[in-house]
Design a protein with these regions (language model features):
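A secondary-structure boundary/capping signal
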Residues: 7-8, 39, 116
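Metal-dependent nucleic-acid phosphoesterase active-site entry motif
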Residues: 1-19
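Activation segment
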Residues: 14-15, 114, 124
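Low-complexity, intrinsically disordered Gly/Pro/Thr-rich segments
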Residues: 117-121
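PIN-domain endoribonuclease scaffold, especially VapC-family toxins
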Residues: 2-4, 23-93, 103, 107-111, ...
């Protein structure tokens, strides 16, 4: 079954009604038919950027707890590739959450991502394949 990677941007927008992408994020979640996949790095980034509103953080945690997103583990053995990606895209610069998502795309053979981050137009999966971006 097809899965869609999801970055922190749409997750933040989903739980922050004042975010300019809020309506787009809500519409995407309502109409999306595919499982969403992310990493703990993106979850952490989302919670950090929602720190202005404890209720939004709690709602987000409940949403994740209910299984709205599938969390993929990044282990010690994966850090070699994360380092390579971070070095390759150091001029952007690539943050840890983004490197985890690019790595996950490689690991799970996925290329569709829900993001508002323009850097994903530059990142390549295994150095070649472009991401299909939703919500940019």
């Amino acid at each position: 079954m097809k899965k869609i990677l999801i970055d922190s941007g749409p997750l933040i927008a989903l739980f922050d009604a004042s975010d300019k992408y809020h309506h787009d994020a809500v519409n995407f979640i309502k109409t999306n038919k595919y499982p969403l996949v992310t990493t703990l790095a993106s979850i952490t980034e989302t919670l950090y950027l929602l720190d202005f509103n404890r209720n939004a953080q709690i709602d987000f945690l409940e949403w994740v707890h209910r299984g709205a997103v599938e969390l993929q583990h990044i282990g010690n053995n994966d850090f070699g590739r994360l380092k390579e990606l971070t070095e390759k895209y150091r001029d952007l610069p690539m943050d840890f959450a983004d490197s985890c998502l690019v790595y996950l795309a490689e690991k799970l053979n996925l290329n569709t991502i829900a993001t508002i981050d323009r850097d994903f137009t530059i990142y390549r999966i295994q150095g070649r394949r472009k991401f299909k971006i939703i919500l940019s």
